[in-house]
């Protein structure tokens, strides 16, 4: 149990960038994605009230589909948006399609998409 307590202390002392890098390393090591889980609401019972109106999606994932011809400009924009280092941003751009930002508001996602497209990238919102 002492090892677990030490692990909790070590994880608590990580900076945000270090925690993001740790999450990325664990995703690669375990072959999983840290995308937010989506809860599924149960439908109305038979003979019940009409189904509620479809809710508008509030969280988006900005996915870099391709770097296009201006790869260096796209890498610069990815660095500015994510705060990643040069190597990490380059790896993300070269490994496209990859998520750039996850669980962001619609207006922020559209802003990021516009920035990346201005730099020459192909971007999708999911």
Swiss-Prot record:
GO molecular function ontology, one term from the record: mRNA binding
UniProt xrefs under Gene3D superfamilies: 3.30.1390.10, Single helix bin
GO cellular component: cytosolic large ribosomal subunit
Key words, A-Z: Ribonucleoprotein, Ribosomal protein
Keyword Isomerase: no
GO biological process: translation
Keyword RNA-binding belongs to the record: no
PANTHER family: 39S RIBOSOMAL PROTEIN L12, LARGE RIBOSOMAL SUBUNIT PROTEIN BL12M
Family recorded in the similarity comment: Belongs to the bacterial ribosomal protein bL12 family.
Function: Forms part of the ribosomal stalk which helps the ribosome interact with GTP-bound translation factors. Is thus essential for accurate translation.
Alphabetized HAMAP family for the sequence: Ribosomal_bL12
Binding partners and assembly: Homodimer. Part of the ribosomal stalk of the 50S ribosomal subunit. Forms a multimeric L10(L12)X complex, where L10 forms an elongated spine to which 2 to 4 L12 dimers bind in a sequential fashion. Binds GTP-bound translation factors.
Name by which UniProt lists this protein: Large ribosomal subunit protein bL12
Name of the coding gene: rplL
């Amino acid at each position: 149990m002492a090892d677990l307590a030490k692990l909790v202390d070590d994880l608590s002392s990580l900076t945000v960038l270090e925690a993001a890098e740790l999450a990325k390393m664990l995703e690669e090591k375990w072959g999983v994605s840290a995308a937010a889980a989506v809860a599924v609401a149960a439908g109305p019972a038979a003979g019940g009230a009409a189904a509620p109106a479809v809710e508008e999606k509030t969280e988006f994932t900005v996915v870099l589909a391709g770097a296009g011809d201006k790869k260096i400009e796209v890498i610069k924009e990815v660095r500015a948006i994510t705060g990643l280092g040069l190597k990490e941003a380059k790896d993300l751009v070269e490994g496209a399609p990859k998520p750039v930002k996850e669980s962001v508001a619609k207006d922020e996602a559209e802003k990021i998409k516009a920035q990346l497209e201005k730099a020459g990238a192909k971007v999708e919102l999911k």
